[in-house]
Structures are given as structure tokens and as C-alpha cells.
Amino acid sequence: EFPTDYDEGEDDRPKVGLGAR
């Protein structure tokens, strides 16, 4: 269950998707 809003405010998940890009 990984939301597509990594850099939005999901610090719980590892920034490996849109956050790392």
C-alpha cells in the first residue's frame, strides 16, 4: 500500500518513488 504522494507528506514510506525523483 504505497500512496503516490511521497513528497506530499508521507514520511512513513521510503522516498523511492516520486519523492526520490
UniProtKB/Swiss-Prot annotation:
Q: Which UniProt keywords apply?
A: Adaptive immunity, Blood coagulation, Coiled coil, Disulfide bond, Hemostasis, Immunity, Innate immunity, Secreted, Sulfation
State where composition is biased (Acidic residues).
1-11
Q: Does the UniProt entry include the keyword Coiled coil?
A: yes
Supply one GO CC term from the record.
Answer: extracellular region
Q: Which residues carry this modification: Sulfotyrosine?
A: Y6
Q: Where is this region: Disordered?
A: 1-21
In its record, the post-translational modification comment is: Conversion of fibrinogen to fibrin is triggered by thrombin, which cleaves fibrinopeptides A and B from alpha and beta chains, and thus exposes the N-terminal polymerization sites responsible for the formation of the soft clot.
Q: Does the keyword Lyase apply?
A: no
Predominant localisation class: secreted
Where does it reside?
Secreted
Any one biological process term the GO annotation gives: adaptive immune response
Domain-related comment: A long coiled coil structure formed by 3 polypeptide chains connects the central nodule to the C-terminal domains (distal nodules). The long C-terminal ends of the alpha chains fold back, contributing a fourth strand to the coiled coil structure.
Function, in words? Cleaved by the protease thrombin to yield monomers which, together with fibrinogen alpha (FGA) and fibrinogen gamma (FGG), polymerize to form an insoluble fibrin matrix. Fibrin has a major function in hemostasis as one of the primary components of blood clots. In addition, functions during the early stages of wound repair to stabilize the lesion and guide cell migration during re-epithelialization. Was originally thought to be essential for platelet aggregation, based on in vitro studies using anticoagulated blood.
Q: How does it assemble?
A: Heterohexamer; disulfide linked. Contains 2 sets of 3 non-identical chains (alpha, beta and gamma). The 2 heterotrimers are in head to head conformation with the N-termini in a small central domain.
Q: What is this protein called?
A: Fibrinogen beta chain
Native species:
Bison bonasus
Q: Which gene encodes it?
A: FGB
